[in-house]
């Protein structure tokens, strides 16, 4: 799983898009290492869009945290983020691996 800031720092659409692009680039690198990459934001955004209502808080973190419980490891990217920190906490509590750089991510 890739955990990184998405909404931290405001609702600037360009910033969110740049952050999501960074997560997706990391996901490609993890895929090339032989793992199946997962990004909570990528799972939640289509559901949020389909709702056609303000369900961001209802959907984003519950989906991301549920995914965290089903993944084997997490790559924590970027700066401060309460959501990403919550995801990492799930991994830590479960005794799963937490990586902070791609350089330390093992081949699958």
Question: Where does each model-flagged region fall?
Answer:
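Conserved catalytic or regulatory cores that recognize and/or transform ribose-phosphate-containing ligands
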Residues: 1-108
